[in-house]
């Protein structure tokens, strides 16, 4: 299992590989927290939040990565595969950031649709 310190180094390596322009107006940067975060819409406690993009008037713009959620979902993976999942999540959150700067909400809508599909599938499976 990758420790939070090791994951922090992986996250730094990934972020360092991104173009500097992506970080424009990301005043709070990327924050790795130890918590596990369950999606409030989770059915049977099986949907975890891996990362979140925050934009607030007082707190600025920043990305949170949840170490505990990553370990719950991907803790069995080797470091290389975990790094790929981490990079995918970070790119996803950066798309939210860039869309926010552009006044777009395409990925937010896609995330909402995916959550709706998840809920409907879980509901359908529960009725079988």
Please describe what each predicted stretch is.
Residues 15, 90, 94-99:
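Amphipathic alpha-helical interface segments used for dimerization/assembly
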Residues 68-70, 79-88, 100-128:
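Post-HEXXH active-site segment of zinc metalloproteases
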Residues 51-90, 94:
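Mid-chain, well-packed structural core segment of small domains
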